[in-house]
């Protein structure tokens, strides 16, 4: 009977931490400038209007507005942020 564990036991037994990737803000949501829209590896989603791309391919909003998912081509999706039309304050006629 062996009194030592097999060599495989010391090489296994670890796992990497999850990177919490994915879509963080969905279509129709109101975002502030600087909000992260998507964390990704590679460019599954491409930056559209008013969206910046970080060095790790993270997409983020450049302005305050509403998120919209669009297709660049049949196979390429882009994410844009469009400004919300501001309502003017109602004036009281008097």
Curated annotation (Swiss-Prot):
One of its GO terms (biological process) is translation. GO terms for molecular function: structural constituent of ribosome. SUPFAM superfamilies: Ribosomal L27 protein-like (SSF110324). Transmembrane segments: none annotated. The keyword Lyase does not apply. Keywords: Ribonucleoprotein, Ribosomal protein. Coiled coil: none annotated. The keyword Ribonucleoprotein applies. GO terms for cellular component: cytosolic large ribosomal subunit. Residues 1-25 are annotated as: Disordered. Belongs to the bacterial ribosomal protein bL27 family. This is Large ribosomal subunit protein bL27. It comes from Gloeothece citriformis (strain PCC 7424) (Cyanothece sp. (strain PCC 7424)). The gene is rpmA.
């Amino acid at each position: 009977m062996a009194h030592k564990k097999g060599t495989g036991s010391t090489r296994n037994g670890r796992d990497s931490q999850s990177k919490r990737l994915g879509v963080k803000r969905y279509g129709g949501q109101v975002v502030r400038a600087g909000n992260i829209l998507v964390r990704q590896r590679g460019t599954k989603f491409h930056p559209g209007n008013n969206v910046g791309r970080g060095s790790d391919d993270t997409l983020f909003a450049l302005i305050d507005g509403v998120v919209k998912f669009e297709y660049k081509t049949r196979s390429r999706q882009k994410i844009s942020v469009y400004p919300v039309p501001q309502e003017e304050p109602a004036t009281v006629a008097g």
